[in-house]
Amino acid sequence: MRNPQPDAALAELLVSVAAKQPACRSTETGSATTWSIGGMVFAMLDGGVAEFRLDVPIAAAAQRTPDTSASPRGSEWVAFRPGLMDHEAADRVTAWFQAAARRATG
């Protein structure tokens, strides 16, 4: 998945992964899309930045991967801005979305 437009590829991938989560709901507000389960927001996309609410140890490890940083939302959140949506970036997005969704279901 090599895409010269990482923002569009990131959005497309998130929509695809979310569609496989039956209890997942998406909400669009302005330029941002949030995903929640049972009212708990666990992921969001705003422009080319995706954020995921993970367990703290996973979030800390995720911050050591390329294009990833701490989120201003707190220690459970990571922000991911891929420069290129290659296979590795897509794998991280998919895994983090799924982990965040599992966490939201308790």
Predicted regions, residues:
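Charge-dense, helix-prone N-terminal extensions
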Residues: 1-106
